[in-house]
From Swiss-Prot:
One of its GO terms (cellular component) is cytosol. Coiled coil: none annotated. The keyword Transcription regulation applies. Belongs to the NusB family. It comes from Treponema denticola (strain ATCC 35405 / DSM 14222 / CIP 103919 / JCM 8153 / KCTC 15104). It comes from the Bacteria. The gene is nusB. InterPro entries: NusB-like_sf, NusB_fam, NusB_RsmB_TIM44. One of its GO terms (molecular function) is RNA binding. Keywords: RNA-binding, Transcription, Transcription antitermination, Transcription regulation. Involved in transcription antitermination. Required for transcription of ribosomal RNA (rRNA) genes. Binds specifically to the boxA antiterminator sequence of the ribosomal RNA (rrn) operons. GO terms for biological process: DNA-templated transcription termination; transcription antitermination. The lineage of its organism: Bacteria, Pseudomonadati, Spirochaetota, Spirochaetia, Spirochaetales. This is Transcription antitermination protein NusB.
Length: 136
């Protein structure tokens, strides 16, 4: 059994936050051993979130450039780790994963921001991603 796409995005987001704050080893993140999901015994069950994490990290320079170009009066290095991880994951989806329509990517990002971010994170994430979508 594999994780669904929504759960996969949550796992990928959590892995990116852990990677960004610097305390997590990438190999540990990618096998999702930190998860306690008895129903996922198949290592292939994590292919979607693993692909999202690897794709985001492999393209981080371009992704961060796109984010920076769409920040008004902000510098990406000053963003909190939660908002940064949501934006990075979403920009990866917008640029490199053409199988998910942009409105769905943005909606998923807003949901992550509402669940894990500050009170205003979802507005900020929505504005940045909307700007990126409109320029592409």
């Amino acid at each position: 059994m594999s994780v669904g796409r929504r759960r996969g995005r949550i796992l990928a987001f959590q892995a990116l936050v852990a990677w960004d704050v610097g305390g997590a080893v990438l190999d540990d993140l990618l096998n999702f051993s930190w998860q306690n999901e008895d129903s996922i015994k198949d290592p292939n069950g994590y292919l979607f979130p693993k692909m999202m994490v690897l794709g985001t990290i492999e393209n981080i320079t371009e992704i961060d450039k796109v984010i920076q170009e769409n920040l008004d009066n902000w510098v990406i290095d000053r963003l909190n780790s939660v908002d940064k991880a949501i934006l990075r994951l979403s920009v990866y989806s917008l640029i490199y994963q053409k199988d998910t329509p942009p409105p769905i990517v943005i909606d998923e990002a807003i949901n992550l921001a509402k669940d894990f971010g500050t009170d205003d994170s979802y507005k900020f994430v929505n504005a940045v991603l909307d700007s990126i979508k409109n320029k592409s």
